[in-house]
Regions:
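Extended polybasic, low-complexity segments that bind anionic RNA or targeting/receptor surfaces
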Residues: 1-33, 78-194
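Glycine/serine-rich anion-binding loops at beta->alpha junctions
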Residues: 39-77
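A short, flexible low-complexity segment enriched in Lys/Arg and Gly/Pro that occurs
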Residues: 17-55
Length: 194
């Protein structure tokens, strides 16, 4: 059969640079950002005594042996743990998701099924479901609300995932070869993005 979809959600123009920005935003917010070097005088070992007197030696004046100019000295403006996250506007995020959905639909990577209910939360049941539908390993199941049995059955499959429509994002849509959802999920996507 076929399902009617809103053209405003599933027939967007693909803006590659916007999609790239969205993916960069997602990956940047995942970064640990924990690069750090010794920063302050308090972080360093070594004497705080003045190596020689200020005047009269003919050498350059120096205050301590941990000056940044000296070997073994502290790092000036070195990296500190920080967040690399940045934001896109709501409109940009929406347009990027619409673009990827349209691209997936055009590439016939969308499968709509009546139900995604599994009786037992077992991996072999998820494999049987995927094999029965001829789905590739990289499959994303989009569900309108939490489906515990499906989530538990799929979580041990390395490349398949279950995602709530509320968590719909460009990265997950791009990473998976096939998107599987129900008419209820499509309705919820349309409500969210129209």
């Amino acid at each position: 059969g076929s399902v009617e979809v809103l053209s405003s959600v599933f027939e967007g123009k693909v803006n590659e640079s916007l999609v790239q920005r969205y993916v960069a935003m997602q990956l940047a917010s995942r970064r640990g950002g924990n690069a750090a070097t010794v920063q302050n005088k308090g972080d360093l070992h070594g004497s705080n005594a003045k190596p020689w007197r200020q005047k009269g030696t003919g050498r350059a004046r120096s205050g301590n042996t941990r000056s940044p100019i000296w070997r073994g000295g502290l790092t000036v403006f070195g990296p500190t743990p920080r967040s690399y996250a940045f934001q896109l506007s709501k409109k940009s995020k929406r347009l990027a998701i619409v673009a990827v959905l349209a691209d997936k639909l055009k590439a016939q990577s969308f499968t709509v099924v009546d139900s995604l209910n599994i009786e037992n939360p077992r991996t072999k049941d998820a494999i049987a479901l995927m094999d029965g539908m001829g789905l590739p390993a990289k499959t994303l199941f989009l569900v309108p609300e939490k489906n515990n049995n499906l989530q538990l059955a799929v979580r041990n499959l390395p490349r398949a995932d279950v995602l709530l429509v509320d968590g719909l994002n460009v990265f997950d849509l791009l990473v998976h070869e096939r998107i599987v959802c129900t008419p209820a999920a499509i309705k919820k996507i349309e409500e969210r993005l129209s």
